[in-house]
Amino acid sequence: MQPRDLSHHVAYEAGRGIEEVARELGLDPDDLVKLSSNENPFGPSPKAAEAIREHADRVNSYPKAAATDLRGEIGDLLSVDAAQVWLGNGGDGALDYLARAMLDPDDGVLVPDPGFAYYGMSARYHHGQVNSYPIEKDDDFEQSPDAILESYDGERIVYLTSPHNPTGSEVSLSDVEAVAEGTDEETLVVVDEAYGEFADSPSAVALVEERDDVAVLRTFSKAYGLAGVRLGYAVVPGEWADAYARVNTPFAASEIACRAGLAALEDDAHVEKTVETARWAREYIRSTLECRTYESAGNFVLCAVGDGGEVAEAAQKEGVIVRDTTSFGLPSCIRITCGTREETKRAVEVVNDLL
């Protein structure tokens, strides 16, 4: 017996972890700086950590009340109805729910290239077809409606990323609307705002209330520092929000995750410190690194270093883990996550010595 044909599927390549690198190189994990996965350098919100401890003895219960409360709090924060908030096991889970709601077998999706691999992975899991639109280095990775619509061929879902991973470029609200206007009535435009807290531009949630063909993806993994508990959500138009009950995995957002999310939403100071430090680090990297860098609205900077794999491997041996972006189709670049001031300065010093 064998599984079905998975030849068109790909494995997700995540940034390397501290423990993995430490074992490989025989180093003390405490001596390593990990700036490869766009994680929060300050850890989770202290309020979220306390909530996890406080509710640890309640994980024998399914998270019905906690999930309901969290959907309500997110709805209040974004000025949408709680029913429009689709909680998932990370942003990936919310992407899966959107695919389940939208895709029949062989329906197409349009994804950015380079871009987040899970858009295509999720579509293929749901028997969809994956097409791409180019984001060109020569255009500073601009995500222009013209280029997107030129590649569009009636796909059921079009994915936009703002800020874009791994380049940091943004899509304006007017450009999101232009894409939505230029696609068919039955095409959903999904705006992935996983890094939205780090950007100055307004959220596309404003368009969700105006249209029935735009949805927004958000996560607690980045600015809130909760990557390990896996919590994200989609905000969908009210006209079809009730589809959630028919496509979600029951209780996929765990009791601990929901309680941590509720507490994190109350910790403005933690988010503000995280965002302020990321903005400082972006500017420091761009002004101090001795190679071309690209303007970023996320908590990371894409850097053209010549041979990304070689530089990333050498930096690792010096105790700094950065992301080789070869898996994104950018072998000449690395991506540096915005760390604390000390971590960021160390990373820039190490990379400069390698250039």
Curated annotation (Swiss-Prot):
The UniProt entry, under Gene3D superfamilies, shows: Aspartate Aminotransferase, domain 1, Type I PLP-dependent aspartate aminotransferase-like (Major domain)
Q: Name one GO biological process term.
A: L-histidine biosynthetic process
EC supergroup of this enzyme: transferase
User: Signal sequence span per UniProt?
Assistant: none
The family database entries (Pfam families) matched by this protein are listed as:
Aminotran_1_2
InterPro entries with a match to the protein in the record? Aminotrans_II_pyridoxalP_BS (IPR001917), Aminotransferase_I/II_large (IPR004839), HisP_aminotrans (IPR005861), HistidinolP_aminotransfase (IPR050106), PyrdxlP-dep_Trfase (IPR015424), PyrdxlP-dep_Trfase_major (IPR015421), PyrdxlP-dep_Trfase_small (IPR015422)
In the UniProt record, the gene name given for this protein reads hisC
Instruction: State which pathway it belongs to.
Output: Amino-acid biosynthesis; L-histidine biosynthesis; L-histidine from 5-phospho-alpha-D-ribose 1-diphosphate: step 7/9
User: Any idea which residues bear N6-(pyridoxal phosphate)lysine here?
Assistant: 222
What protein family does this chain belong to?
Belongs to the class-II pyridoxal-phosphate-dependent aminotransferase family. Histidinol-phosphate aminotransferase subfamily.
What is its cofactor? pyridoxal 5'-phosphate
Reading the lineage from the top rank, the first entry is: Archaea
The protein depicted here goes by the name Histidinol-phosphate aminotransferase
A GO molecular function term, named singly, is: pyridoxal phosphate binding
- EC no.? 2.6.1.9
Query: Could you tell me what reaction this enzyme catalyses?
Result: L-histidinol phosphate + 2-oxoglutarate = 3-(imidazol-4-yl)-2-oxopropyl phosphate + L-glutamate
Q: Which UniProt keywords apply?
A: Amino-acid biosynthesis, Aminotransferase, Histidine biosynthesis, Pyridoxal phosphate, Transferase
